Amino acid sequence: MSLCLVIACMVTSWIFLHRWGQRNKSGPKTWPLVGAAIEQLTNFDRMHDWLVEYLYNSRTVVVPMPFTTYTYIADPINVEYVLKTNFSNYPKGETYHSYMEVLLGDGIFNSDGELWRKQRKTASFEFASKNLRDFSTVVFKEYSLKLFTILSQASFKEQQVDMQELLMRMTLDSICKVGFGVEIGTLAPELPENHFAKAFDTANIIVTLRFIDPLWKMKKFLNIGSEALLGKSIKVVNDFTYSVIRRRKAELLEAQISPTNNNNNNNNKVKHDILSRFIEISDDPDSKETEKSLRDIVLNFVIAGRDTTATTLTWAIYMIMMNENVAEKLYSELQELEKESAEATNTSLHQYDTEDFNSFNEKVTEFAGLLNYDSLGKLHYLHAVITETLRLYPAVPQDPKGVLEDDMLPNGTKVKAGGMVTYVPYSMGRMEYNWGSDAALFKPERWLKDGVFQNASPFKFTAFQAGPRICLGKDSAYLQMKMAMAILCRFYKFHLVPNHPVKYRMMTILSMAHGLKVTVSRRS
């Protein structure tokens, strides 16, 4: 009994001294053995804002965990060092790869070294293609108009819609057509159930939880809890992905066998989609290894082309609803585009009746005809609205890197090999030391000088990463977002459904936890 009492006193004293030694510590307080895991788990649903609170006064926060240490950074000097200056010391790393492998495999977002370089080189070549850009422009307009039609029906029927759900459908259909050459029709008028999207989102949430769940490997081994659900979700994801790959391979084979029977549309798809390019350069397209690598490529492009774009558009529409002055300025810019086009072609603007379904839709089709790569490039305020959205609500709110060798960041913070360094775009966009005293305000004008958009350093505005891993699809993403926003914001006002909760969901992408329920009204 006395021995137990002595041990209890020793443990209590140890814990007390451990906590007492942290009384002046600026970062999260830790406990013996578990580090800051308790505080992180307690704040899991608001982790991005939890980091903002620490990084506001300290540009670097060190968070010890049971098996590693996370170092979070928000100072552009440190970010540039990690993403560019000493890039080779900060790969994705084995830890990150082990967490994400079940979902992203060895795709471009989850690989390092020669495998990453090979995929990036191929993707870079495709994204630089004018043919892909022109094909993408047509596809993005097509699906933006499909979304418009659904919203038009909702406006006449005075129905609520979930904009996040609709935008996720639009971007999934778009990436499947542009990236993989197939049409899947999730944005059809009847809005068919989308099992893949639900399973993909579930898997994304669970792999994100792995970063702070020290028991995930045990749960995976026992096939219980969240890891059991992950396994079921991945099966749905894989079934869909392999069906896309096999369908595309069959179409390519058919095109080779009967090239004269293909119409122009099929020829375009054969030439311009990204998946076809990866199939063509593979040594043995029908081997299991190749199918697995193609699966990884497809899912990495899905998360890049569907999730990030739809999430940004969702937050952009929300911010426009919350800032009516921004909505009106954007509307004026879109009207000005119409007027300039009419003057350039010496034609009069078509009049339409917002209460007449056909008249309204005809006007929209006419306006969409004005939108192309060049005309969208003139919409500087729209570009600023999207960029300002990304500053405050970056699609990828934090991005961890592994540490290969012991190192010291420019501000003097020491990092150990085997740890992780995470730059935090969500926090960086809210820091006054990065953006000034009005950092918390949604202010598209901060990006304009004499009405012309001005870029910021990619190490300060990190929504598209920076350095050797800078996002290859940045221009394509802006193209799709501007196409959709131009059509929607020219003809609609959005109204948040009363009492609808707006908060983010903890996953690798900053999506809304409850969607974005709105009603829409037609503009004259």
Curated annotation (Swiss-Prot):
The chain crosses the membrane at residues 2-22. The keyword Transmembrane helix applies. GO terms for molecular function: alkane 1-monooxygenase activity; heme binding; iron ion binding; long-chain fatty acid omega-hydroxylase activity. It catalyses: an omega-methyl-long-chain fatty acid + reduced [NADPH--hemoprotein reductase] + O2 = an omega-hydroxy-long-chain fatty acid + oxidized [NADPH--hemoprotein reductase] + H2O + H(+). Keywords: Heme, Iron, Membrane, Metal-binding, Monooxygenase, NADP, Oxidoreductase, Transmembrane, Transmembrane helix. Heme binds at C471. GO terms for cellular component: membrane. GO terms for biological process: pollen exine formation; sporopollenin biosynthetic process. Involved in pollen wall development. Catalyzes the conversion of long-chain fatty acids to the corresponding omega-hydroxylated fatty acids. Omega-hydroxylated fatty acids, together with in-chain hydroxylated fatty acids, are key monomeric aliphatic building blocks for sporopollenin synthesis during exine formation. PANTHER family: CYTOCHROME P450 (PTHR24296). This is Cytochrome P450 704B1. The gene is CYP704B1.
